[in-house]
Amino acid sequence: MANQLQVPKQKLAKPPLAIHTLGDRVLRQGSKQISGINDEVRKLAQQMLQTMYSADGIGLAAPQVGVNKRMIVVDIDPENAARPPLVLINPLIKQFSSDLAVDQEGCLSVPSIYADVRRPERVVATYRDLNGRPVTLEATGLLARCIQHEIDHLDGVLFVDRVENQIALAPQLVEKGFAVRDVQVRA
């Protein structure tokens, strides 16, 4: 089977998976390694991509859809049909740059909340593709940020945990109906 899934980059009226939000315990669990890549894993990747596109996202981790597995999907250019999305199975960041950048992040699991997060500008990640082959990827800019954000989900970390200005974040969370106590500060 080819590494690339054929998933139209479009919104579905009824996405295949529900996205869990801040406060749901599934988002705080560490995820389990995927031991073998089979049709079930490929189907999950396809459904995650469909769900991500339907929610206007650029990344989604399996725990966000209630699946305790180490898999993320990323597409930082969802408007470009020629650029295929990435499916990273058992991803691991092997190297972080010392150069840090602050940029605004949002999350499908914390809808309508945006805040500045400081992250390394460049990372080197390893993962398995949909054929089980090992891949090493050097990423910069938005792609590096997105990969770090999604891998955080695999370890039970949400972007709101990394926000340095928690005082400014708290009123936003309350306004959108989230409990401030659900944030686990790691900034």
From Swiss-Prot:
Record-linked InterPro entries: Peptide_deformylase (IPR023635), Peptide_deformylase_sf (IPR036821)
Name under which the protein is recorded: Peptide deformylase 2
Pfam families: Pep_deformylase
Names of required cofactors: Fe(2+)
EC number: 3.5.1.88
Annotated family: Belongs to the polypeptide deformylase family.
Domain of life: Bacteria
The entry's keywords: Hydrolase, Iron, Metal-binding, Protein biosynthesis
GO biological process: co-translational protein modification; translation
Keyword Metal-binding: yes
Taxonomic source organism: Gloeobacter violaceus (strain ATCC 29082 / PCC 7421)
Catalytic activity: N-terminal N-formyl-L-methionyl-[peptide] + H2O = N-terminal L-methionyl-[peptide] + formate
Keyword Protein biosynthesis among record annotations: yes
Gene Ontology terms for molecular function: metal ion binding; peptide deformylase activity
Cofactor binding annotation: Binds 1 Fe(2+) ion.
Enzyme class per UniProt: hydrolase
Function per UniProt: Removes the formyl group from the N-terminal Met of newly synthesized proteins. Requires at least a dipeptide for an efficient rate of reaction. N-terminal L-methionine is a prerequisite for activity but the enzyme has broad specificity at other positions.
Residue numbers binding Fe cation: C107, H149, H153
Active-site feature positions: E150
